[in-house]
């Protein structure tokens, strides 16, 4: 199996407090992995570093073989993300987490964020908006039918993967708490 996420020697300090200390982990394609620990152990901070919300004090994060977050020994941090040309990189001082999301990695939050008046299926479809490629003209004249069909098929596949396909037509708020978290 190939590595989809690699966290290498990541440390995150806030003043004198070390919230994450030399974190190393590797997640292979197809694996579902949980980060478990007591309150205050640094789980949320680790996710915030991995997804680009925080800049690490030390270490690097790789996603799908590309380095997306890196701290240089001199203390000058730079984040990297794919540029327009395949294989090229654009170096910026502080890209927002949406750049990392565009690469295909997103995170969930401790508080559930659902569109309460929407179905389970529609919640996932709405969340996939950053994966659509329709321009204004195509959307205005409903020329995006094929892409819409592809998005709907992908949503069905995702719901099947997490065991929510059977409740796809239910309102998101009608689900038990555990299933809402999965959604």
List the predicted regions and their residue ranges:
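Conserved ABC transporter NBD signature motif
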Residues: 59-71, 77-89, 103
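Conserved ABC ATPase "signature" region
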Residues: 135-167
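The feature captures the beta-strand-to-loop junction immediately N-terminal to the Walker
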Residues: 36-38
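Q-loop/switch helix immediately C-terminal to the Walker
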Residues: 111, 117-139
């Amino acid at each position: 199996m190939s590595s989809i996420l690699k966290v290498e020697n990541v440390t995150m300090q806030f003043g004198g407090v070390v919230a994450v200390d030399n974190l190393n982990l590797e997640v292979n394609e197809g694996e579902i992995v949980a980060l478990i620990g007591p309150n205050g152990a640094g789980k949320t901070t680790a996710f915030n570093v991995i997804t680009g919300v925080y800049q690490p004090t030390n270490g690097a994060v790789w996603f799908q073989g590309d380095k997306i977050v890196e701290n240089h020994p001199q203390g000058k941090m730079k984040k990297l993300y794919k540029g327009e040309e395949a294989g090229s990189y654009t170096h910026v001082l502080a890209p927002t987490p949406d750049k990392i999301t565009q690469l295909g990695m997103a995170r969930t939050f401790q508080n559930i964020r659902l569109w309460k008046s929407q179905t389970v299926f529609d919640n996932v479809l709405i969340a996939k908006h950053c994966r659509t490629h329709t321009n204004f003209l195509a959307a205005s004249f409903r020329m995006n039918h094929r892409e819409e069909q592809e998005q709907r098929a992908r949503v069905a596949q995702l719901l099947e993967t997490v065991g929510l396909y059977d409740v796809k037509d239910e309102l998101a708020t009608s689900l038990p708490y555990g299933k809402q978290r999965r959604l």
